[in-house]
Amino acid sequence: MALDIHAHRILILDFGSQYTQLIARRVREIGVYCELHPFDMDDEAIREFNPRGIILAGGPESVHEANSPRAPQAVFDLKVPVLGICYGMQTMAEQMGGKVEGSDLREFGYARVDVVGKSRLLDGIEDHVDDDGVLGLDVWMSHGDKVTQMPGNFSVLASTPSCPIAGMYDDALGYYGVQFHPEVTHTKQGGRILSRFVQDICGCEALWTASNIVEDAIAQVRAQVGSANVLLGLSGGVDSSVVAALLHRAIGDQLTCVFVDNGLLRLHEGDQVMAMFKENMGVKVIRADAEKQFLDNLEGEADPEKKRKIIGRTFIDVFDAEASKLENIQFLAQGTIYPDVIESAGAKSGKAHVIKSHHNVGGLPEEMNLKLVEPLRELFKDEVRKIGLELGLPYDMVYRHPFPGPGLGVRILGEVKKEYADILRRADHIFIEELRKADWYHKTSQAFVVFQPVKSVGVVGDGRRYAWVVALRAVETVDFMTARWAHLPYELLETVSGRIINEIDGISRVTYDVSSKPPATIEWE
């Protein structure tokens, strides 16, 4: 009998915290399947989900405000372990008969909590032991309200001078609350705390591994698709590449990929995609060379948003044209990943509860009467990368920096021309090549060159040069919501600048972008 890697599962209820997806990723890293749902999930849906344990996440609300979020009653009726984090601890306390009050002293940032209770959750987990034998943890706090009276048979788990009940527990029920955030890396023992809850207290086995996920996904694809044929738009990005490798492993020649070469890709990228999938892996790939069509449609347009729309529409037109030549296609594959699913799934409070498909190929599924196959829809980006490696894709492809859908079209400021794209491609290639040589590529989260449609005077030999300006951009980030400009060594910048100006006829000046996000965005357009 096939292994059910979803059998041991954790339910995470989202109360609006910026860290909620991080909790899910941490639980998955432990090797346990979990799902993230809105706090107002139906009682019946919770019972049907049948979790081994439940995590109540944090949120920005105050429990004593009218209509503030509450955990569904099913959470406490199921008799499974529950971990409340921050707001989750407060609503647990309030709903079970305790008391929560506003605090004059809010806690945001690093804190040290004393572990004062002997619980299963924190037994043997500490960062410090003081002279009196009191255990301490270095944690990350982010709260205003605090629990001032615990419900029922709860005991104090942890405390700080300003928050005497910074944690509470009832080992008999398997209920725990912590006012700090174990899911963020600033809480040093956070991984051990979550592992203790998920594995030891909830009894979940680590079945959620890359090899098991691949086997499970292959089995699901085969069951869904049968002997039918599947179409995939292959971009060369991480998600579509992993989908292609996975589907090829599952159904072989039943898969046909269409790779649209829009003339706005990185240097040699089209050839690399074809070599990887068609020549090395034996995948059926149709290459549509549509550079002229894209550039013709972009001619004269300088507005960034309009450029994006033109590129998107043209992609759909080209993809449609290629797809219409194929016969007997029943399924369209897409690289939808779990964050897409979370974003498009709402709560019942006026938001759509139905998960919408991200139709990155427009209305094609409806027009061609195709059914969707989305083998990555349960996976976070880091998990997609891991199964990419498991499927044999090269590390450099799987861990490549993000590249925008419109490609170089949004890295050429203003109107897009073939001349600009050709210059930019070469400059970008030099920058990335030198980052790799200096071992800086994987220290940066994203790095690229931007073409600026302005000219600057330069000197080459004894002659005057009047040529284009490009900007180097490199950032470090964890989540791409905020980013710091990368502090690259001056020697590296000097090498890159020298090579670009000397090797590319048409560039006279190289600048380095030292803007962080916010206030700037990572991409220029």
From Swiss-Prot:
Pfam families the UniProt entry points to: GATase, GMP_synt_C, NAD_synthase
Keyword set, alphabetical order: ATP-binding, Glutamine amidotransferase, GMP biosynthesis, Ligase, Nucleotide-binding, Purine biosynthesis
Reactions listed under catalytic activity: XMP + L-glutamine + ATP + H2O = GMP + L-glutamate + AMP + diphosphate + 2 H(+)
Ranges of residues in domain Glutamine amidotransferase type-1: 9-207
Pathway membership, UniProt: Purine metabolism; GMP biosynthesis; GMP from XMP (L-Gln route): step 1/1
Catalytic residues, chain numbering: C86, H181, E183
PROSITE patterns: GATASE_TYPE_1, GMPS_ATP_PPASE
Domain called GMPS ATP-PPase: residue spans: 208-400
Residues annotated as binding ATP: S235, G236, G237, V238, D239, S240, S241
One GO molecular-function entry: ATP binding
Gene Ontology CC: cytosol
SUPFAM superfamilies xrefs: Adenine nucleotide alpha hydrolases-like, Class I glutamine amidotransferase-like, GMP synthetase C-terminal dimerisation domain
EC number: 6.3.5.2
Keyword Secreted annotated: no
Function: Catalyzes the synthesis of GMP from XMP.
Assembly with partners or alone: Homodimer.
NCBIfam families: guaA_Cterm, guaA_Nterm, PRK00074.1
Stated name of the protein: GMP synthase [glutamine-hydrolyzing]
Gene expressing this chain: guaA
